[in-house]
């Protein structure tokens, strides 16, 4: 009976074991954002990518993303503003990472839909957005964009900064 149970468990988990695992490449990946402040566009970025991506375009049901960025790396090319964002908006000493984790992936032929959870500070919210995945040599290049409302995540209070911002992801992940 134990052998039958073991065989069943192996069959159940074998697709997950066969998935190719990828890790974000810091130097080739970007997370950028655009937001309005006093009516002017402000562009910024984050670095410090970490996490794992298990991806097989033929087995999306078993594929998943669990990626973080370092909140303290926020950069808008203005040191004074960046310090304010780290301390007052992102509270990086208490909340050092921003996490994006999938719960479901859909699509085909290089065009997909990410459904999952975005965590900033102590708030986790559902998120869904289209993305592309292109295999280049032994690495995938994942690109997607979405809009969020910063106040939904408790980021910053009332200020002259717009609530809505656009986020662009361009993540290169190498096969482990």
Residue ranges and their predicted role:
Residues 1-5:
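Positively charged n-region of N-terminal signal peptides that target proteins for export
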Residues 7-16:
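Bacterial N-terminal signal peptides
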Residues 20-176:
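Low-complexity, acidic/polar, glycine-enriched regions of mature
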């Amino acid at each position: 009976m134990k052998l039958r149970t073991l065989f069943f468990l192996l069959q159940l988990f074998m697709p997950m074991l066969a998935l190719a695992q990828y890790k974000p490449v810091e130097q080739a990946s970007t997370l950028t954002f655009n937001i309005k402040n006093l009516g002017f566009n402000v562009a910024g970025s984050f670095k410090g990518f970490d996490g794992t991506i298990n991806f097989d375009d033929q087995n999306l049901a078993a594929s998943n993303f669990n990626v973080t960025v370092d909140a303290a790396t926020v950069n808008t090319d203005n040191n004074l503003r960046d310090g304010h964002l780290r301390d007052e908006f992102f509270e990086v000493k208490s909340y050092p990472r921003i996490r994006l984790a999938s719960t479901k992936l859909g699509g085909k032929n290089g065009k997909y839909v990410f459904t999952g959870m975005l965590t900033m500070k102590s708030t986790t919210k559902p998120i869904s957005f289209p993305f592309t995945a292109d295999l280049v040599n032994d690495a995938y290049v994942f690109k997607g964009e979405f809009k969020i409302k910063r106040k939904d995540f408790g980021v910053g209070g009332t200020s002259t900064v717009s609530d809505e911002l656009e986020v662009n992801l361009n993540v290169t992940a190498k096969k482990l």
